[in-house]
Amino acid sequence: MAKTIKITQTRSAIGRLPKHKATLLGLGLRRIGHTVEREDTPAVRGMVNAVSYMVKVEE
């Protein structure tokens, strides 16, 4: 089984760049406090890195 990471949205997407809003939706995050589990792949890591100021990551 592939390694997974937990991603939690900690800040609002209101007023953010459209690309960053799209990245949050791509990760499956919709609201503050929402947590999702995703596979730990370079693509997901890149998305998390782009919106790192709005999310918290747990290994």
From Swiss-Prot:
<dbReference type="GO" id="GO:0003735">
    <property type="term" value="F:structural constituent of ribosome"/>
</dbReference>
<protein>
    <recommendedName>
        <fullName>Large ribosomal subunit protein uL30</fullName>
    </recommendedName>
</protein>
<comment type="similarity">
    <text>Belongs to the universal ribosomal protein uL30 family.</text>
</comment>
<dbReference type="InterPro" id="IPR016082">
    <property type="entry name" value="Ribosomal_uL30_ferredoxin-like"/>
</dbReference>
<keyword id="KW-0689">Ribosomal protein</keyword>
<dbReference type="GO" id="GO:0006412">
    <property type="term" value="P:translation"/>
</dbReference>
<keyword id="KW-0687">Ribonucleoprotein</keyword>
<dbReference type="InterPro" id="IPR005996">
    <property type="entry name" value="Ribosomal_uL30_bac-type"/>
</dbReference>
<dbReference type="GO" id="GO:0022625">
    <property type="term" value="C:cytosolic large ribosomal subunit"/>
</dbReference>
<dbReference type="InterPro" id="IPR036919">
    <property type="entry name" value="Ribo_uL30_ferredoxin-like_sf"/>
</dbReference>
<comment type="subunit">
    <text>Part of the 50S ribosomal subunit.</text>
</comment>
<dbReference type="Pfam" id="PF00327">
    <property type="entry name" value="Ribosomal_L30"/>
</dbReference>
<dbReference type="InterPro" id="IPR018038">
    <property type="entry name" value="Ribosomal_uL30_CS"/>
</dbReference>
